[in-house]
């Protein structure tokens, strides 16, 4: 395929960061579309543009969570901007609420009720394994606890970035096929996941996630006509973290 791209035999190339590597050459690159723009560095985007011969290609960047530099360019740079400010037909806004320690059991009960309706849920943790330095819950430990103590009788799956790609793909496919009611995960599901039947995103230690991460995680639900809910399990934390969660 690399040789066919170089010879111009392929009109449309869809890829990842791998398209930036040196041995990928384009015969006549006319348009670059970068999705999830905040995941690409400035130099990476520049190197991709440099693969084009003159004239320079048109560039379309897309993101739901623009980084500060991108926001500055919309004000001070020479950019044309298009804004998609409405949901696709049939979808409703995701309801977001903060869950305190006292309300944790109530929140778990709510998740179970959603599953009893035939829906599915994500439960996201900031760590894969327990850490001696951080007093935080981990995905691997909590997956077992939730399965044995909280969501007994339900199918609970585990997904994290340290798994091999084939295993991650298998688990995600099984979740899409509704072989799991609940998927316990880390930030690995932040982008590229589409499960219309999932209506709950529960984020443990939400104060440990950045605003863009929270927004991306919430975007994994609300992809059907069913009302969806984002539950932010958070301790008081700093003023900055409280403001981030409130946003």
Predicted regions and their residues:
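Inter-lobe coupling/hinge segments of SF2-like helicase ATPases
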Residues: 1-246
């Amino acid at each position: 395929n690399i040789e066919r791209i170089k010879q111009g035999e392929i009109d449309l190339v869809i890829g990842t960061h791998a398209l930036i590597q040196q041995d990928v050459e384009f015969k006549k690159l006319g348009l670059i579309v970068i999705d999830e723009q905040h995941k690409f560095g400035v130099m990476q985007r520049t190197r991709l543009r440099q693969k084009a011969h003159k004239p320079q290609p048109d560039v379309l960047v897309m993101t739901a969570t623009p980084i500060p530099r991108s926001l500055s360019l919309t004000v001070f740079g020479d950019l044309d901007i298009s804004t998609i400010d409405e949901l696709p037909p049939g979808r409703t806004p995701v309801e977001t609420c903060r869950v305190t320690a006292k309300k944790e059991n109530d929140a778990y009960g709510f998740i179970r009720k959603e599953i009893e309706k035939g829906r599915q849920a994500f439960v996201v943790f900031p760590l894969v394994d327990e850490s001696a330095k951080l007093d935080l819950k981990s995905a691997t430990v909590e997956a077992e606890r939730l399965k044995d103590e909280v969501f007994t009788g339900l199918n609970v799956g585990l997904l994290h970035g340290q798994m091999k790609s084939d295993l991650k793909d298998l688990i995600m496919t099984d979740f899409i096929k509704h072989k799991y009611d609940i998927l316990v995960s880390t930030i690995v599901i932040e982008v590229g996941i589409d499960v219309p039947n999932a209506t709950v995103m529960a984020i443990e230690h939400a104060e440990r996630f950045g605003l863009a991460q929270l927004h991306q995680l919430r975007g994994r639900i609300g992809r059907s006509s069913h009302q969806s809910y984002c539950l932010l399990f958070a301790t008081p934390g700093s003023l900055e973290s409280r403001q981030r969660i409130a946003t």
